[in-house]
Design a protein with these regions (language model features):
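A non-catalytic alpha/beta surface segment that caps or lines the substrate-entry region
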Residues: 54-108
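Alpha-helical metal-binding/catalytic segments enriched in His/Glu/Asp
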Residues: 114, 121-127, 131-186
Length: 251
């Protein structure tokens, strides 16, 4: 298990480390890389003003799902979900049913046996949208565009999908890329994926969740829970990903 998790963890590195970095000394050397430029473009698109913060069930969340689906198609990533994503409903107390969606892409593993086992990489589609606040005694509507939460995670998701598709010969297991809707509504998209949509949950060997990756400082956190294998991988890589030093947080 440690071996394939190591491959998965290393697949995350190219998002931050381009070929330029091998001769560089800091994050500044990454600024001109094609991958970083692509990530920035994704973040701009997914946090655009017209999406109004991608609130669960909103037109903005729908457009974000369509954007992720479009990127998967352009990158040659196969889709498990139908065009427009897989719809599901969330019952609201005393209100109408909220309709959200998941978009799931995949890159099939090369091993004839292990391709039936799965690694899941996921990121939430939605943010909190708009909120009315009181400023100087007057109601003011504020839009939470969600560049960090979670356009950053979605941007990495689609770029990782591209990289895994390009380097599919490295992956014995099938890798699923899941953009999950309605996370701010009791994580409904994740629940729907595990309990209604995907029939082979017992074959999922590892899962990485990408959330709020734009930390604003030179570092990132790896929340591994109680996964002993992943803890070992993070501890090993923390000494190798210069100048990146993951801080391990268990819970």
């Amino acid at each position: 298990m440690k071996r394939f998790i190591s491959v998965l963890a290393l697949a995350l590195v190219p998002m931050l480390l381009s070929a330029q970095f091998r001769n560089g000394t800091g994050y500044g050397d990454l600024d001109d890389s094609e991958t970083v430029a692509a990530v920035k473009a994704h973040v701009r698109s997914l946090s655009a003003a017209h999406l109004e913060g991608r609130k669960a069930g909103s037109e903005g969340e729908k457009e974000a799902a369509e954007y992720v689906e479009q990127m998967f198609r352009e990158y040659g990533v196969d889709l498990l979900t139908p065009a427009g994503g897989e719809l599901f409903g969330v019952m609201k107390d005393g209100r109408d049913t909220l309709t959200s969606r998941n978009v799931i892409g995949y890159v099939e593993g090369y091993d004839k046996t292990l391709r039936n086992d799965y690694i899941v990489v996921a990121a939430r589609l939605d943010n909190i949208g708009t909120m009315t606040m009181t400023v100087d005694g007057k109601p003011v509507e504020r839009v939470f565009y969600g560049a960090n939460g979670n356009a950053s995670g979605l941007a990495m998701l689609v770029e990782l999908a591209r990289m895994v598709r390009t380097n599919s010969m490295m992956f014995r297991r099938t890798v699923l890329f899941a953009a999950l809707g309605a996370s701010n509504e009791t994580f409904a998209g994740a629940w729907y994926f595990l309990n209604r949509s995907f029939p082979e949950t017992d074959r999922i060997d590892a899962m990485v969740n990408l959330d709020m990756l734009g930390t604003g400082y030179n570092g990132f956190y790896a929340y591994t829970g109680s996964n002993v294998d992943m803890n070992a991988v993070v501890n090993t890589l923390s000494g190798e990903l210069q100048p990146i030093h993951p801080e391990l947080v268990t819970g």
